Swiss-Prot record:
SUPFAM superfamilies: ARM repeat (SSF48371). This is Nuclear cap-binding protein subunit 1. GO terms for cellular component: nuclear cap binding complex; nucleus. Belongs to the NCBP1 family. GO terms for biological process: 7-methylguanosine mRNA capping; mRNA export from nucleus; nuclear-transcribed mRNA catabolic process, nonsense-mediated decay; regulatory ncRNA-mediated gene silencing; RNA splicing. Residues 702-716 have a biased composition (Basic and acidic residues). Component of the cap-binding complex (CBC), which binds cotranscriptionally to the 5'-cap of pre-mRNAs and is involved in various processes such as pre-mRNA splicing and RNA-mediated gene silencing (RNAi). The CBC complex is involved in miRNA-mediated RNA interference and is required for primary microRNAs (miRNAs) processing. Also involved in innate immunity via the short interfering RNAs (siRNAs) processing machinery by restricting the viral RNA production. Gene3D superfamilies: 1.25.40.180. It comes from Aedes aegypti. It is found in: Nucleus. One of its GO terms (molecular function) is RNA cap binding. The lineage of its organism: Eukaryota, Metazoa, Ecdysozoa, Arthropoda, Hexapoda. Transmembrane segments: none annotated. Keywords: mRNA capping, mRNA processing, mRNA splicing, Nucleus, RNA-mediated gene silencing. Component of the nuclear cap-binding complex (CBC), a heterodimer composed of Cbp80 and Cbp20 that interacts with m7GpppG-capped RNA.
């Protein structure tokens, strides 16, 4: 054998492979370059947008032969992921269609497929942006007006279906209405009568629909000075105003107008007949919302005028700002910079628009899209980027919110207090407190003094107590929180007369000497049980409150130095907690002692109860019962108590979600392994002459497959655990709502008997908390709506209470 020849052959082989790699690499580079060019079009450039578009279209046309599918995919994704550049991409597609009719047809088919897939997969925003883009292609002479009108008519038909949720019907009308600012003028000029018929059908629909959900979504309970309109009503008013103006708007950039002479010569495509997919029970539709208004033109200084509430420009500006927040909410600096760099920023009072939109997001009911701190951090970045204007606008907004706080929704009150305390902590807690001192003359339960008190309590979590003495005017002394110190009764004056004092002191010594949990139980065993009042009691008491009192208060007082010390103490003596807290009554007793010790430190209470839930020392139902107990009456309107209740509900919800996911994964693995075993047995029993499974092929099977394979018995046990968790979750909600009904009914009956007005501050706080539970946990509560309706929210309870439940059920009806 000629070795030289062999090496030469090898050289040819490796050379060929190298050329292939180089060719693949070049293709990848070209694809990435094309993608970058398409994504970046319309961004800062030294040349005009029109010349950029012409150049890019020429590049894309020359590369269609090699990268057709890639170009189709990118061009169909961009207007959905970057809806603010919709008209730029429609112009680009229009120019390509004018040069290459076949490509235009392929693109329309691709876009229609994207639209239909978005509807099937319940990606409602993507579907709406796809519909908008298809509509804008009419302006670029890519799609015919007749076929678009047919699509819009089909969507209105979907809105008039019977026996489907109203939220589905609402979305289809919203999608059509929100598209009209882009294509309304074109339809008006070419198909005026068809457009009018479409609008008449929409008006009939809007006049018939119910709005029971409206009140539960309002930020304020009154409409002065700004009405709080339901989103479809507001958009309809804006579209009617646009129609009065002959569909002429001043906000949407329309680069295709510069190419009208080219585009008008292009052949158009007809959309295929598109029918929205039928409703399925698994479909989740967007919930309704109320359009938030904080400012009007009188609030803004001299300069650009804020568009009116019913001008389409207001809708377009707000939608653009919302989409920027959605795109950049993970990075606050980028988000703030992009908000301040909005197109047409010189034609509007931008700072006022931004602040209004951010508070609209923060106060969105039933829950904001993102964490409260997300909006707070964006506002701080905005103040840093624009220190000459933004802090003043934000201060003005805060003043407006405080003045209107009397009628503010309870959930929004909490978010406002959380945001304001966080904001103050980033600006050295400076504020013109003297401007608000008139609130000191009001009742303590009134929202204004209550707001300041809650803000200071939240600030205390972010600072230290002495800071408040220096920071706050003396007139506010009654609202300043007490020092956050434990109240340990066994060292206070008069402690000698308490029955557990001697044992408490022994326990302190024992714990400091690093005793075991068994030693602690031994110290506690001789304490008398105050529940056994007589020697003749035949039934032994299920728990000893004195043991719990002495142990819990002593241990937590010793761990009071920090959260870490407290957690370490709870972990070390977990056995003692579990031994003493065998019943729900005993667990409530533990919670009572946590409250008694830490009554002046709300954050410590929240953190300890969270730890007790995580370590399963107390059950969620015990916390719910304790929150509504008589000893907590004085705390009932304080925010921290509801923080505890909501974290308890979330713990239960997370537990159910975790078990549900584990069961789903186990079933999937079981099915997968069953299929794998079946195919293996088929291969092993293959007839002679066919490929059998060799030992080498068997070895390629992942090692973990059999190890992770669950048995049917394990899956059954997991199903039982999940079923038990659902029962616990339902019981938790039943306890909470039953207690709400009891205390509210008692208040209403008492006021009626005494001839007093029931609408007190306490009543409004309590109804607000009931609404808050429904709203914050709407996804979980809706599963038990029928149970709640049949057992608790029956027709015989007071209409004021029943109305809250009906508003909740209307959210997804």
């Amino acid at each position: 054998m000629n070795r030289r020849r062999a090496y030469e052959d090898d050289g040819d082989f490796y050379g060929e492979r190298s050329r292939k790699r180089r060719r693949v690499s070049e293709n990848q580079e070209m694809e990435e370059r094309l993608e970058t060019l398409i994504l970046r079009v319309g961004e800062n450039s030294s040349s005009s947008l029109e010349s950029n578009l012409e150049g890019l279209v020429s590049v894309l046309e020359s590369d269609l032969g090699n990268f057709r599918s890639k170009i189709l995919r990118i061009l169909s994704e961009c207007p959905i992921k970057m809806p603010e550049k919709c008209t730029i991409y429609s112009t680009m597609v229009g120019l390509m269609n004018a040069k290459n009719y076949n490509f235009g047809g392929e693109f329309v088919d691709h876009m229609v497929k994207t639209f239909k897939e978005s509807l099937k997969q319940c990606r409602w925003d993507a579907a709406r942006y796809a519909l908008r883009f298809l509509s804008d292609l009419v302006n670029c002479h890519v799609i015919s007006t007749n076929s678009l009108l047919q699509l819009l008519d089909n969507m209105v038909d979907a809105a008039n279906e019977d026996s489907v949720p109203q939220v589905r019907r609402d979305w289809y009308v919203f999608a059509v209405l929100s598209t009209l600012p882009w294509v309304g003028r074109e339809l008006y000029e070419k198909k005026e009568s068809a457009l009018e018929n479409l609008l008449v059908r929409i008006e009939v629909f809007l006049n018939k629909r119910t709005k029971k959900h409206h009140n539960s979504l309002r930020v304020w309970s009154v409409d002065a000075p700004h009405p709080q309109e339901e989103y479809l009503d507001c958009l309809w008013a804006q579209i009617r105003k646009l129609r009065q103006d002959n569909w002429a708007e001043k906000h949407i950039p329309r680069p295709y107008l510069a190419f009208d002479s080219v585009l008008c010569e292009a052949l158009q495509h007809n959309l295929p007949l598109i029918h929205p997919p039928p409703h399925q029970d698994s479909f989740e539709y967007p919930m309704p919302w109320v359009v938030y208004r904080m400012f009007d033109y009188t609030d803004c200084p001299a300069g650009p005028i804020l568009p009116g509430a019913h001008s389409i420009e207001r809708f377009l500006i707000e939608e653009h700002l919302h989409s920027i927040i959605e795109a950049h909410h993970w990075e606050r600096k980028d988000c703030a910079a992009n908000l301040l760099n909005l197109s047409y920023k010189d034609k509007i009072p931008l700072e006022y628009c931004i602040v209004e939109v951010i508070f609209a997001e923060l106060f969105k009911m039933p829950t904001p899209r993102y964490l409260d701190i997300c909006y707070g951090s964006i506002l701080i970045e905005l103040c840093k980027l624009q220190p000459s204007k933004m802090p003043q606008v934000l201060a003005q907004a805060t003043e407006i919110l405080f003045m209107r706080i009397d009628s503010m929704n309870t959930s929004c009150f909490d978010r406002f207090a959380n945001w304001f305390s966080y904001h103050l902590s980033n600006f050295q807690f400076r504020w013109s407190w003297d401007d608000w001192d008139s609130c000191l003359l009001l009742e303590p339960e009134h929202p204004r003094p209550k707001f300041i008190e809650e803000v200071l309590l939240k600030c205390l979590r972010l600072s230290y107590h002495d800071r408040f003495k220096e920071m706050m005017p003396e007139t506010y002394s009654k609202l300043i929180p007490k020092p956050p110190m434990p109240t340990y009764k066994y060292t206070m004056e008069g402690a000698a007369s308490l029955p557990g004092t001697a044992t408490a002191h022994k326990l302190v010594v024992a714990i400091r000497q690093k005793c075991t949990p068994e030693d602690v139980l031994n110290e506690l065993k001789d304490l008398p049980n105050p529940r056994e009042t007589s020697e003749n009691d035949m039934v032994e008491s299920t728990f000893n409150p004195l043991k719990i009192d002495v142990f819990v208060q002593t241990l937590l007082n010793l761990g009071s130095k920090s959260f870490s010390h407290t957690f370490a103490a709870i972990s070390k003596f977990h056995l003692v907690f579990k031994t003493l807290a065998e019943t729900e009554e005993a667990q409530i007793c533990i919670l009572h002692n946590v409250f008694e010790l830490w009554v002046n430190h709300q954050q410590m209470m929240v953190v300890i109860i969270d730890k007790l839930l995580k370590t399963q020392i107390v059950e969620c139902s015990a916390v719910a019962t304790w929150v509504f107990s008589k000893e907590m009456v004085g705390e009932f309107t304080k925010m921290y108590l509801w923080e505890i209740l909501h974290l308890t509900i979330k713990k239960m919800n997370q537990h159910v979600t975790k078990l549900s996911k584990e069961l789903s994964d186990a079933k999937e693995r079981l099915d997968r392994n069953a299929e794998s075993s079946s195919s293996e047995s088929e291969e092993e029993t293959a007839p002679a002459g066919t490929d059998a499974v060799t030992p080498q092929r068997r070895r390629k099977k992942p090692i973990g497959d059999n190890a992770d394979k669950p048995t049917e018995e394990q899956v059954e046990r997991m199903e039982e655990k999940l079923e038990a968790a659902y029962v616990d979750q339902k019981r938790l909600f039943l306890i909470i709502f039953q207690r709400f009904i009891m205390i509210l009914s008692e208040h209403l009956v008492k006021c009626d008997t005494d001839g007093r007005d029931y609408d007190t501050d306490w009543y409004r706080w309590t109804v607000g908390r009931l609404q808050q539970v429904f709203m914050m946990h709407h996804e979980q509560v809706k599963k038990y709506s029928s149970t709640l309706e049949s057992l608790l929210f029956t027709s015989d309870i007071d209409p004021h209470i029943l109305d809250v439940f009906h508003q909740f059920t209307a959210l997804r009806s």
